[in-house]
């Protein structure tokens, strides 16, 4: 069984390398037209150049998974801001794409919790489509839209989970097919359990990104041993390994909050269940210390008898 690892957005080991530098709409409004464009394009260029630095770092450390920052282009989906963030930066998008393709990196996006399809308010669905389209356009500009995924949560329950799930199935029809084809769903830590999310994924033929920490915070009746094969099966039509999110609680009191690093004892039960099924899969680490947490976890896991480190961020068990 091969397990590959990756992390989210910022490489903590790199100095001044945020790929998510921002520009607020408030500061944008205060500037003249030319100043707005100059400032905004400067921030975007920084984010893209920092992303390139991070990709070089990942390649050097043989880290095959990476989640791009959704904030890579500030104000991209703001209704009062219109600008060309694709054509102007074509050389940089292509440079990012060339690195990803040459080194066979697995890239993803994870829009925020407001991008959802369960609401009864039409503007929420419209905004979700706008946000999903923004993420897809970036993947397309990079040249990896047909092999990369945009991951979201199911959404809210709004007092009636059954009705909300029905709305999800209706609202998702409004998302263009080519974008839906590149989306995944994740179980959350309060509302939609692993079993509920799996059912939705199966009905819509959407790959399921299983989050173990969320599962432990929002348990369902069905045991994970029974659910995991079906979860992994949702990826079968993609020819890509299933992906799992890993983090651990900050404390018993703050169980849902993410700790700085991964507590190996917390994730061991999941790893043993996965080993029983012996299916290759990828792990996205969602700890606060990101790449540093990744290295620490791999060091700890590779010290276990029977687990062999075969590259910077890949284990064989």
Swiss-Prot record:
InterPro entries named among the record's database cross-references: UvdE (IPR004601), UvdE_bac (IPR023520), Xyl_isomerase-like_sf (IPR036237)
GO MF entries: endonuclease activity
Enzyme class, broadest EC rank: hydrolase
Record-linked Pfam families: UvdE
SUPFAM superfamilies, per database record: Xylose isomerase-like
Annotated Gene3D superfamilies: Divalent-metal-dependent TIM barrel enzymes (3.20.20.150)
Keyword set, alphabetical order: DNA damage, DNA excision, DNA repair, Endonuclease, Hydrolase, Nuclease
EC number, UniProt record: 3.-.-.-
Biological process annotations from GO: nucleotide-excision repair; pyrimidine dimer repair; response to UV
Record-linked NCBIfam families: uvde
Function per UniProt: Component in a DNA repair pathway. Removal of UV LIGHT damaged nucleotides. Recognizes pyrimidine dimers and cleave a phosphodiester bond immediately 5' to the lesion.
Family: Belongs to the uve1/UvsE family.
Protein name: UV DNA damage endonuclease
Native species: Bacillus cereus (strain ATCC 14579 / DSM 31 / CCUG 7414 / JCM 2152 / NBRC 15305 / NCIMB 9373 / NCTC 2599 / NRRL B-3711)
């Amino acid at each position: 069984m091969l397990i590959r690892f990756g992390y989210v957005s910022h490489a903590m080991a790199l100095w001044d390398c945020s790929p998510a530098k921002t520009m607020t709409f408030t500061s944008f409004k205060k500037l003249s037209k030319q100043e707005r464009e100059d400032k905004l394009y400067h921030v975007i260029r920084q984010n893209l150049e920092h992303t390139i630095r991070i990709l070089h770092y990942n390649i050097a450390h043989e880290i095959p998974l990476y989640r791009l920052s959704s904030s890579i282009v500030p104000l991209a989906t703001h209704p009062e801001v219109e600008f060309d963030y694709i054509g102007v930066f074509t050389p940089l998008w292509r440079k990012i794409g060339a690195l990803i393709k040459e080194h066979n990196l697995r890239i993803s996006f994870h829009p925020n919790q407001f991008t959802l399809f369960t609401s009864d308010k039409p503007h929420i669905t419209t905004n979700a489509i706008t946000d999903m389209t923004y993420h897809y356009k970036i993947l397309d500009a990079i040249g990896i839209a047909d092999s990369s995924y945009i991951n979201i949560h199911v959404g809210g329950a709004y007092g009636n989970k059954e009705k909300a799930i029905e709305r999800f199935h209706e609202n998702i029809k409004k998302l263009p097919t080519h974008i839906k084809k590149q989306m995944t769903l994740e179980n959350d830590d309060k509302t939609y359990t692993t079993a509920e999310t799996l059912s939705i994924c199966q009905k819509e033929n959407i790959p399921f990104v299983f989050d173990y920490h969320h599962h432990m915070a929002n348990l369902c009746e069905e045991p994970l041993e029974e659910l995991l094969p079906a979860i992994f099966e949702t990826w079968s039509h993609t020819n890509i390994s299933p992906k799992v999110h890993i983090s651990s609680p900050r404390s018993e009191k703050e169980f849902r909050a993410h700790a700085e690093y991964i507590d190996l004892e917390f994730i061991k039960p999941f790893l043993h269940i996965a080993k029983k099924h012996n299916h290759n899969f990828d792990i996205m680490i969602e700890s606060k210390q990101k790449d540093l947490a990744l290295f620490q976890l791999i060091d700890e896991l590779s010290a276990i008898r029977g687990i062999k480190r075969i590259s910077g961020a890949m284990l064989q068990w």
